[in-house]
Design a protein with these regions (language model features):
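Generic structural signal for residues in well-ordered beta-strands
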Residues: 41-45
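Helix-loop-strand module that forms the ligand-binding subsite of alpha/beta enzymes
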Residues: 48-125
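Short helix-loop-beta junction
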Residues: 23-39, 119-124
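N-terminal beta1-alpha1 ligand-phosphate binding loop
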Residues: 2-33
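Short histidine/acidic/glycine/proline-rich micro-motifs that form metal-
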Residues: 15-16, 101-106, 132-137
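Residues at alpha-helix caps and immediate loop-helix transition turns in enzyme cores, especially N-
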Residues: 21-22, 76, 110-113, 140-143
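Hydrophobic residues within alpha-helices
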Residues: 21-29, 114, 147, 151
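Glycine-rich phosphate/pyrophosphate-binding loop and the adjoining helix
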Residues: 36-37, 52, 124-158
Length: 158
């Protein structure tokens, strides 16, 4: 683990609903990271199309955010996994992650595709996936905040 643990949020924020979820995740992560000044956590956000292997290797935990597009994760998040898979395969085994997915009708295929990629990388699910259908509710945004806060807090314990 790095001297100061790093939480990397990789996202494809293509809609107002995803932007709301991303903001809530980031707020929770930053507040969770700042909860104990003795154990700081750096929270880094990268769009899925620009995040790369160096970002992943320098991080200690991950949050993945994507729309559910045509029964799959976004092409941007798929591109991210394609770019990082082999360079990060051995070095990131058992790293904790969480994810949030927004869909208008269904998120099943998007979640399944994320699970396939993260299983291949041997990452460990640290929080239940957050799946949101339709406009995010207050409860959805609170769950997104909790996702960010929980992953950041987990890094203060390691």
């Amino acid at each position: 683990m790095a001297a100061v643990p790093v939480l990397l949020v990789v996202h494809h924020t293509a809609s107002p609903a995803l932007h709301s979820l991303f903001d809530a995740v980031m707020t929770g992560a930053r507040e969770g990271a700042a909860a104990d000044p003795a154990t700081p956590v750096d929270v880094v956000a990268r769009p899925a199309l620009t995040a790369g292997a160096v970002d992943v290797l320098e991080a200690d935990a991950y949050i993945l955010g994507t729309p559910a597009n045509l029964g799959y994760m976004s092409g941007a998040l798929k591109h991210f996994f394609d770019q990082i898979y082999y360079p990060c395969l051995e070095a990131t085994v058992r790293r904790p992650f969480g994810c949030y997915i927004h869909g208008n009708n269904d998120t099943t295929g998007a979640l399944r595709s994320i699970q396939a990629a993260t299983t291949g990388l041997k990452w460990e699910l640290a929080q239940p996936p957050l799946e949101v259908i339709g406009p995010p509710t207050k409860e959805n945004l609170e769950a997104a905040w909790e996702l960010g806060a929980a992953l950041a807090a987990r890094l203060t314990l390691e």
